[in-house]
Amino acid sequence: AGHGSFLHDENAVTYLAEAVAKLGNHTFPLVISDSVAEFLSAVAEETGLDFDPASPDLDGTLRKLGSIARIVGATLRDTANPTMLKAGYKANVIPQTAEAVIDCRVVPGRQAEFEREVDELIGPNVEREWITALDSYETTFDGHLVDAMNAAVLAHDENGRTVPYMLSGGTDAKAFAKLGIRCFGFAPLKLPPELDFAALFHGVDERVPVESLEFGTQVLEHFLLHS
């Protein structure tokens, strides 16, 4: 700590700002998990697009998916998005400490490598700790529940197809997995093609069309009554 009018070789805000910028601008390596591979294969069959992991323009191909490209892209690699900053108590005082919160989403099986990369990026002047630490979770797409999901969708949309995907957001599946319970995300919505649904998440106008909810309710009712 010290007076803001003096020269300072060490500044917690500067150290933190540099670390946060490096993390926020870093692109983690491409990782295709089994679930994502199955999803891309199914989408390729339906759209004719070629999702070749070796392609230098894989991200460009993903953009052709439209509004879901950001969701799918977030499952192909780890992400570390700065969301909160805290430092200082007065404009003319150099603070002793500075803190940042980084929203990290790690592809299953990448935890150790992710932490190593983060440590290299933030450097020796910044310490890190996990606020919440639960391993990423993935299961195989099979079993009677999967069959019941598919049957429920087909009962209300004869052109529907149930495919696995990986959710970059957090769910209770991470906790249930520790108890040996397999979890699947199943929230069927029939959305208008022009709606950028992902852009509404945690936004000022977050919403879902009533018709989409009605469809989802019918599918879930069928699922619960027949599974």
Regions found by a protein language model. Give the residues of each.
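Metal-dependent amide/peptide-bond hydrolase catalytic core
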Residues: 1-215, 221, 225
